[in-house]
Regions:
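Noncatalytic N-terminal accessory/assembly modules of large enzymes
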Residues: 1-36
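A short secondary-structure junction motif
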Residues: 223-227, 231, 286, 290
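Active-site recognition of the HExxH zinc-binding catalytic motif
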Residues: 211-227, 235
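Post-HEXXH active-site segment of zinc metalloproteases
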Residues: 226-248
C-alpha cells in the first residue's frame, strides 16, 4: 500500500523525501504547464513524511495533473507518484517518469470524429525501475490516493476518489516490441509481407503513429456499445476469456473503422495510409505478439489472438501449410470486418 512501517528507516526516508520535494519545486519553474501539479506533489510528499510514512495520499497532486488538457506533439511532463505499475510491480513505490506527448496533426483531425478526450499517447524519455517492465501504460488508478468526501457535500455523502480524466499509453514501447516480435515471427513462419507492412516494421516513428491511431479508436470503444459482460467485472479482468472478447470487440471496431477510412477517397492521403497500417498492426499484434510474449496462464490478450487466428484460418484467408504462413491480403479486410 506504499506505507513504510519500519521506523528505523524513517530518518533516511525523510531526507530522501525532502530532496524529492525540493527538486519538484525547482523543476516547477521550468515546466510551466505542470507547475500547479509539481508544487502540489511536493506538498503531498512532505505531508506523507510528516505523517510518519503511513499510507501515502496523493489526492491533491493527482487532482492537479491534467496532461489531457495540453495534447501538443512533443509536450514534456514529469510524473512522480507512489504507485504500482501495470504488468510490473504490484507494490506501491515512488516512481518517476519523464515523458512527452505524441500527437501528430492527422490524429488531431481524426479525433474530431473519434472523440477520446482522456486519451494521452506518450513516449518515454526516462523512468525509474518500476517501468523496466512490460508496462506500456500509466493510469491514475495506480496512484496512492485516499477517497474523500467532496467539499460542501451533504452530511452522509460517501467518500470519493478524484475524477480520473486521463490515461497515458506509451506508444513508443508498444511500437518497439511490436516491430521486434513481428519481424522475427514473420521470418520464422516465412510469411511474405507487403511492402507497406515491411516499412511499418522498419520505421519506429511510423509504427508509433500507427499505434496512436489504433489506440485512439480502441480505447474509446471500451466505453461505447454493448459489453460482453457485467461492466463491474472490468477491474478484475474476469472471467479472463470474456475479457479477451472485450479486447477483440475494441480491436475489431478499430479495424472496421480503419477499413472504412482507408477506402474513403474524401479522407486525406496521410490518414488513409495510417488506416491501412493499423490493419496490419491489429492483425500482427493479435496473432503474433500477444500469444508469443505474454504469460501462458490466463492471458486474455492471447485468447483473443487465438480466436482471430482460428477465424481467419476457417475463412480460408490464412493458411499454415508445410510450416509456412500465407495470408490472402486482398480478402483479409472484409473477412476481419465480417467477424
Amino acid at each position: 500500500d506504499g506505507s513504510i512501517p519500519e521506523k528505523s528507516v524513517h530518518k533516511i526516508c525523510a531526507i530522501a523525501v525532502a530532496g524529492i520535494a525540493g527538486s519538484l519545486r525547482e523543476i516547477a519553474d521550468s515546466i510551466e504547464h505542470d507547475r500547479e501539479y509539481l508544487l502540489s506533489c511536493a506538498l503531498d510528499f512532505e505531508r506523507w513524511s510528516d505523517s510518519g510514512f503511513t499510507v501515502p495520499d496523493f489526492f491533491d497532486s493527482l487532482s492537479a495533473f491534467h496532461p489531457e488538457k495540453n495534447r501538443v506533439d512533443g509536450t514534456p511532463h514529469l510524473v512522480v507518484f507512489p504507485m504500482y505499475t501495470q504488468n510490473g510491480s504490484t507494490d506501491r513505490f515512488v516512481e518517476a517518469v519523464v515523458l512527452e506527448i505524441i500527437w501528430p496533426e492527422f490524429i488531431a483531425e481524426l479525433e474530431k470524429n473519434y472523440s477520446n478526450p482522456a486519451f494521452v499517447p506518450v513516449r518515454f524519455i526516462d523512468f525509474t525501475p518500476g517501468y523496466l517492465t512490460n508496462s506500456a501504460v500509466i493510469f491514475p488508478e495506480s496512484v496512492a490516493v485516499t477517497p474523500r468526501v467532496p467539499e460542501g457535500a451533504e452530511p452522509g455523502t460517501p467518500a470519493e476518489l478524484p475524477v480520473f480524466s486521463w490515461g497515458g499509453i506509451f506508444a513508443d514501447r508498444e511500437a518497439a516490441r511490436f516491430r521486434k516480435v513481428v519481424q522475427t515471427a514473420s521470418e520464422v513462419t516465412r510469411l511474405e509481407l507487403p511492402a507497406d507492412a515491411q516499412e511499418l516494421l522498419q520505421n519506429q516513428q511510423l509504427a508509433e503513429h500507427t499505434f496512436v491511431m489504433w489506440d485512439l479508436i480502441h480505447d474509446r470503444t471500451h466505453m461505447r456499445g454493448d459489453l460482453p459482460f457485467d461492466p463491474f467485472m472490468i477491474k478484475q479482468r474476469m472471467p479472463f476469456f470474456l475479457y479477451g472478447l472485450e479486447e477483440m470487440r475494441c480491436d475489431l471496431t478499430a479495424f472496421r473503422e480503419c477499413v472504412k477510412l482507408s477506402r474513403d477517397k474524401s479522407v486525406d492521403a496521410e490518414t488513409r495510409k495510417f488506416a491501412s497500417l493499423v490493419q496490419y498492426a491489429v492483425l500482427f499484434d493479435r496473432i503474433f505478439r500477444f500469444p508469443l510474449t505474454g504469460t501462458r496462464k490466463r492471458n486474455y490478450d492471447s485468447v483473443a489472438g487465438q480466436l482471430l487466428f482460428a477465424y481467419l484460418h476457417k475463412s480460408h484467408v490464412l493458411h499454415w501449410t508445410d510450416t509456412q504462413l500465407t495470408i490472402d491480403w486482398a480478402e483479409l479486410p472484409d473477412v476481419v470486418v465480417s467477424l
